Each structure stands twice: as C-alpha cells, then as structure tokens.
C-alpha cells in the first residue's frame, strides 16, 4: 500500500504566499501541496464568484485537483472597497495611498478576507472563507508582503507585518479559510 499523498496544485506564483500556506496547513495536511503559476485572467465581481471562476479555469489548465486563493482588504467606510482589487490599489497608491483613501473618514475599520476555492479533478469548486477584522493604520513593519504593514487586527497592537509569522499564522484570514478547507478535506466520507 502506497503512503504517497495525492497531489493538490496551489495556483500561485507568490513565494511568500506559498510559504505561509504550507506553514498553516502543517505536516498532517492530507495532500502533497505543489505550486504552479498559471496565467489566469483578472476577473471582476464578487470575491466568492471570482475565486470559483479562477478555480474552474485553473483546473482546466492543470488537469487535476487545484486550490486557488482570492484575498480582499475591505474598508468599512468605503462599503468594502478596495476589496478583491487591493493588489491593484496597493500597486498604484502604495501603503500611504491606502491610508489616504480613508483620510476623510473617522471609521478606519476594515477586514481582511481570504477565499480559497478547491476543486478535485473534474468537480465544481467549493469555497472556504476566512475573515479577520481590524483597522487600517500608517505602515509599520517590513514592507515585503503586500498590505500587511497597514492592517492591524483587532485585539493586537501590531500590524500583520510586525507580528511573528507564527502569531500571524494563528489568527489571519488565510489561516481561518485554510482551517475550514482542512476540516472539509479530513471529514469522514460516510455519515
């Protein structure tokens, strides 16, 4: 009997994201996680719909089980914007620009949302969502991982960027979504 785990392809070209996902999933994850950068169109719409469609498109290219992620940073004062477009807002405005977007508002609250879409080969994607609530603050900490320097989770005095990786990986939006995925994948098949 083979002890080899089935392969699950995580569709990302982001090395930081891959390291974080592997650290969160841990050695007991029932799949061998491999990453692959797949050229997917930039979709627009609601985050769960974006994640599902990216998953469908990736599954066609990979021809196997896939996992895709869509991350949002949602400002409550802006009714959820920039949301799934955070990557582009950050690229164009920088960390200071994200803060400037809220300059006219008293409400600096926000939530980080991570949606993982998982599809076994030939199946419809399933969605797993995690959210962490916090606030937008002037950038603090290393600027090597997206918007982490401007997001301070509720109950903490540090931004994601200032936190030890172990701490962040126990409270983050990504952790919460991956825990839901893990729970789904290790649940008993029959009832």
From Swiss-Prot:
Mg(2+) binds at residue 42. CDD domains: HAM1. Its EC number is 3.6.1.66. Signal peptide: none annotated. GO terms for biological process: deoxyribonucleoside triphosphate catabolic process; nucleotide metabolic process. InterPro entries: ITPase (IPR027502), ITPase-like_fam (IPR029001), RdgB/HAM1 (IPR002637). It is an enzyme of class 3 (hydrolase). It catalyses: ITP + H2O = IMP + diphosphate + H(+); dITP + H2O = dIMP + diphosphate + H(+); XTP + H2O = XMP + diphosphate + H(+). ITP binds at residues 12-17, 54, 70-71, 87, 145-148, 168, 173-174. It is found in: Cytoplasm. It holds the Pfam family Ham1p_like. The keyword Metal-binding applies. Its cofactor is Mg(2+); Mn(2+). Gene3D superfamilies: 3.90.950.10. One of its GO terms (cellular component) is cytoplasm. Belongs to the HAM1 NTPase family. PANTHER family: INOSINE TRIPHOSPHATE PYROPHOSPHATASE, INOSINE TRIPHOSPHATE PYROPHOSPHATASE/HAM1 PROTEIN. Pyrophosphatase that hydrolyzes non-canonical purine nucleotides such as inosine triphosphate (ITP), deoxyinosine triphosphate (dITP) or xanthosine 5'-triphosphate (XTP) to their respective monophosphate derivatives. The enzyme does not distinguish between the deoxy- and ribose forms. Probably excludes non-canonical purines from RNA and DNA precursor pools, thus preventing their incorporation into RNA and DNA and avoiding chromosomal lesions. Homodimer. This is Inosine triphosphate pyrophosphatase. The lineage of its organism: Eukaryota, Sar, Stramenopiles, Oomycota, Peronosporales.
């Amino acid at each position: 009997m083979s002890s080899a785990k089935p392969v699950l392809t995580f569709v990302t070209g982001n090395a930081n994201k891959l390291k974080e996902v592997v650290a969160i999933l841990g050695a007991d994850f029932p799949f061998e996680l491999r990453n692959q950068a797949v050229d997917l169109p930039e979709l627009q719409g609601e985050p769960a719909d974006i994640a599902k469609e990216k998953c469908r498109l990736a599954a066609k290219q990979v021809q196997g089980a896939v996992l895709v992620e869509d991350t949002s940073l949602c400002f409550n004062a802006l009714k959820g914007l920039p949301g799934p477009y955070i990557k582009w807002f950050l690229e164009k405005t920088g960390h200071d620009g994200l803060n400037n977007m809220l300059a006219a508002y008293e409400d600096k609250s926000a939530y980080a949302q991570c949606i993982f879409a998982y599809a076994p080969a030939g199946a419809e994607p399933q969605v797993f969502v995690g959210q962490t609530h916090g606030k937008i603050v002037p950038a603090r900490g290393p600027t090597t991982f997206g918007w982490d320097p401007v997001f301070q989770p509720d109950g903490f005095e540090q931004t994601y960027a200032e936190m030890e990786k172990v701490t962040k990986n126990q409270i983050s939006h990504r952790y919460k979504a991956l825990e839901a995925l893990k729970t789904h994948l290790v649940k008993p098949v029959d009832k």
